[in-house]
Amino acid sequence: TSGNRIETSIISSLPPSSRYTETEALSLSTEEKFKWFEYYKFKFSLKHYQSLRPDKNIVLTSKFGIGYLGYFNKEVGTVPFGRYFMGGTGITNFDVSANEYIGLRGYESEDISTAIGDPLAIKLSFELQKKVVETDQFMLSTHLFGEFGNTYQSLVDLDPYNLKSSIGFGGKVYAPIIGVIGIDVGWGLNKTDFNWKTPAVQFTIGMDIGDF
């Protein structure tokens, strides 16, 4: 299996309507400040699949993704929804506030982002997968992975050299009746207090969960 997949999306609210000055914005309540839901959201992802053997039993998957939640009025700032959280498997993916959960195996969902989420996220991952068993109705595979990512509070804070990293291994079961179920054992290499020595065991359901 070899190939590429590129996805880009731009989501925007209605055209900006607020005309608050800095002084006016400071006196507004949160409900008043964000009543127009003025924002735009950009996402880009690139996935590359490369077979390393003629029988296609070993495949290297490389993924890159970036997402940004922007605003039209700097006095109002970033809306309190649609933000990014990073860590874990991202199995939740979305919540009622339209926040997005980007997986970074080896970490928990609260380990990387701020408590309210961040408007900017970036992630790079590599996974080397080997088929172990394959039939018409079932496939079992094992894999090694390395992931790098972070979230930032603004574009100014973006630092591609400041990425959290993790390594690990796992396995996946593919079956038409149950879909895809996976298990990963990962080490978050940037955890503090030597917590990186204790691996995180995490489960996934479905394909591309926790990606952009």
Ranges and model annotations:
Residues 1-132, 137, 144, 152-154, ...:
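C-terminal outer-membrane beta-barrel translocator/porin domains of Gram-negative envelope proteins
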Residues 52-53, 158-160, 191-196:
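Short proline/glycine-enriched turn/loop segments at secondary-structure junctions
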Residues 103-105, 149-166:
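Outer-membrane beta-barrel transmembrane domain signature
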